[in-house]
Amino acid sequence: MRLSRDGVVVVHHDATVDRTTNGRGPVAGLTADELARLDAGYHFDGFRGRAGGVPRLDEVLRRYRDVRLIIELKLNDAQLAQRTVDAVRAADAVERVSIGSFGTRVLRAVREYEPRIPSGASREETRLALYRSWVRWPVRRPAYKEFQVPEMSGSTRVVSPRFVRYAHDAGVVVRVWTVNDESDMRRLLSWGVDALISDRPDRAVEVVRAAAR
């Protein structure tokens, strides 16, 4: 999530619209209406002219009322935290979302403003938890409810059977990104991870169903 020029929470990964749309410039330099008029599928085969514009968070929450969502905040900014929570409340979606970010400040703002919404560990919190797992020093009552993490960070292994056990002992679920290979999916599931974040949901659904049989 990012904020448009007029302070609306919009669903967009990059800081600029250049890579994915037919527009140019920073997301923060355009209003929500201007972002909505762009072609969000412009640079993707088969989606040019068909994907619509950059959506607002409240539109997505209302369109997919039966879907549980992870909302990632791309700015370490308290205003983004508050406006995101406001959108979640307005859509009556508090019970079906979790919020993640690399930034500690924005996650602390979410937790203070709406304690009912589960949040992921920030990069700093994840790093500390990983170190503690290496020395078998348990986390006591963490502020976060999820790890939303890659299996590897550079040359450092984040997710391992030990890390998953450590997280579960602390009451924290482990969601791993970005897992597109089926053999990786099966291995991670065998370690007990709670969710796979993937660019290939078609593969992931089949692997998860097979593992549950």
Task: Indicate residue ranges for each PLM-predicted region.
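Short gly/pro/ser/thr-enriched loop/turn and capping motifs at secondary-structure boundaries
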Residues: 18-19, 107, 126-129, 203-205
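A cross-domain feature marking catalytic cores of carbohydrate-active enzymes
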Residues: 1, 73-75, 101, 121-123, ...
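Alpha-helical scaffolding within the catalytic cores
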Residues: 53-59, 125-136
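C-terminal active-site rim and adjoining tail of enzyme catalytic domains
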Residues: 47, 122, 130-213
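Short alpha-helical
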Residues: 4, 78-79, 105, 182-183, ...
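Short acidic, Gly/Ser-rich segments with clustered Asp/Glu that frequently serve as metal-coordination loops
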Residues: 1-10
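Metal-dependent phosphodiesterase/phospholipase catalytic core, i.e.
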Residues: 13-113, 142-170
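Structural detector of well-ordered beta-strand residues that form the stable sheet scaffold
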Residues: 10, 70, 98-100, 118-120, ...
